[in-house]
Amino acid sequence: MFSNLDQITLLVILFSLCLGGFTKGVISWGFPVISLPILTIVLPPTSALFLLFFPIIFANIREINFKNMRNYKKLIPFSIGIFSGILIGSYIFHNTKSEIISIAIGITIIIFAFINFKGFKINEILVSNKLFGLLYGLFSGIIGGMTTVLGPLMIIYLVSLNFSKEKFSQNVSFLVFATLIPLYIMFFTYQKVVVNDFLVTSLALIPAMFMQYLGLKIRDKIPQKTFKNLTLVFLTVVGLLVLYKHLL
C-alpha cells in the first residue's frame, strides 16, 4: 500500500501529519479534515485513510472523558444515525473509482470551509430533537463514509449544541473515535492490509502526536478564531488543489 514512495510524497505526508496534529491540538478538531485531503494529492484515498488509522485513534482517545460517559448521553441519537450512515457511505466509497472519491473529498472540504467560515448553526429546537439528531447523523454518516471526511457535518452539529470549550473538545474526540469503528470495519472488509502497512501507520504517530502535544500546550495562547479562519482558508486551497489534480 505504501511501497515506492518518492521524497516529495514523503514530505507531503510528513507535512499533512504535522499540520493535522497541530490543528487538532489547538482547536480540538481538524486532524483528518486537514490531513486527508492533503494526502489524497499524493496517495489514493484508501491508502490515505489507512495511513491515518493509528494517528486518528490516539489523537482523539487522549481527550475523551472515560470517567464520566454520561456526558455523551445527549449524543446517542446522532451517534446511532452516523454509525448507520457510515456503513452505507463506506460501501459506496469502496465500490467507486478513487478519482471520483478524490473529487468528492475536494468538493466536501470546500463546502465545509465556506459553511464554517460563515458560522452556520442548526436551529436550537431542531438540534435538541432526537429524531432530527438521528436523521442528521444518518445523513452525516453517509456523506462522511462516502468521502471519508467525517468531521464537517459533525462539527456543525456539535457547535449548534453550544457546549463549553472543554466539553466541545471531549465530544468531538468521542464522536470521531466512535465513528472509526464502522469506518474501519468496512475498510478491513474491502481492503487487503499487510503487516508493513501497520508499521507505516504506527510511524505516522510520531509527528502527529508530537505536533498535537505542541498544539495543546499553546491552545490558550493562540487566538482560536484567527487560527480557525486561517485553517479554513488553507482547507479551501487544498480542496481546490485536489479538484485541480483530478479534474484537469
Model-found features: residue ranges?
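Small-residue-enriched transmembrane helix starts and helix-helix packing motifs
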Residues: 1-23, 127-142
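Membrane helix-loop-helix hairpins that form the core translocation module of multi-pass transporters
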Residues: 46-118
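Hydrophobic alpha-helical transmembrane segments in multi-pass integral membrane proteins
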Residues: 88-94, 98, 102, 142-149, ...
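Cytoplasmic-side transmembrane-helix entry/capping segments in multi-pass membrane proteins
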Residues: 71-82, 103-108, 127-137, 170-174, ...
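Transmembrane helix exit motif
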Residues: 60-70, 104-128, 213-217, 237-248
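Small-residue-rich hydrophobic segments that form or flank transmembrane alpha-helices
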Residues: 14-74, 141, 151-205
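Interfacial loop-to-transmembrane junctions
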Residues: 214-236
